[in-house]
Design a protein with these regions (language model features):
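Mature-chain termini and adjacent capping regions
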Residues: 1-179
């Protein structure tokens, strides 16, 4: 009895699917990834348990990338509890899922809480997500769920500005209506 060997296409397809599933798992677990930081200068203060990075700072955790002028990391029991980044403007991006558009944002000040998956943008903050633009003096962004909360609930004087762009129409729909 002759056994059928799987075709090379089968092996190729299996390889592609396994690579895509590994990539998706990495994006869902950004908070479990180490934080890497590159900068022009770095100092660590053992008394305050903080490290300060200045000059063209790039910090990366999984698919989250932040570019800033200055970054201060606050440690609790040796773990990075809070990262405060500042810049003119500091910028971030995250790839939420494989094949999805990157979510990007900017502000003058940002606070990132890795354990809580929370990014808070302060002072002229903007987030570009899907086809929408969110602008406010305060925006909270959950890096795990991609949920955006803009504005302050305690004040009526500060407004949130949102632009929702319409999705482009499918070309096949246009063809059927023109015939």
């Amino acid at each position: 009895m002759k056994k059928n060997k799987p075709s090379p296409l089968f092996y190729y397809g299996t390889l592609i699917l396994s690579l895509l599933s590994c990539n998706a798992a990495a994006l869902e677990t950004d908070a479990e990834q180490p934080i890497t930081i590159d900068s022009n200068t770095a100092t660590y203060d053992d008394l305050t348990a903080t490290s300060t990075y200045i000059g063209n700072v790039v910090s990366i955790q999984g698919s989250i990338v932040v570019h800033s002028d200055k970054l201060v990391v606050f440690f609790v029991d040796g773990d990075a509890e809070k990262l405060v980044f500042t810049g003119n403007k500091a910028k971030f991006k995250q790839t939420p899922n494989v094949g999805a558009k990157d979510i990007t944002g900017e502000s003058f000040i940002g606070h990132y809480f890795p354990k809580a998956n929370q990014l808070v943008l302060i002072d002229t903050a903007t987030i570009w997500k899907d086809d929408g633009i969110y602008a406010s003096d305060l925006i909270e962004y959950n890096t795990k769920t991609s949920l955006v909360n803009a504005g302050e609930k305690t004040t009526d004087t500060k407004r949130v500005h949102v632009i929702l762009k319409p999705k482009s129409k499918d070309k096949s729909i246009n063809k059927s209506t023109n015939q």
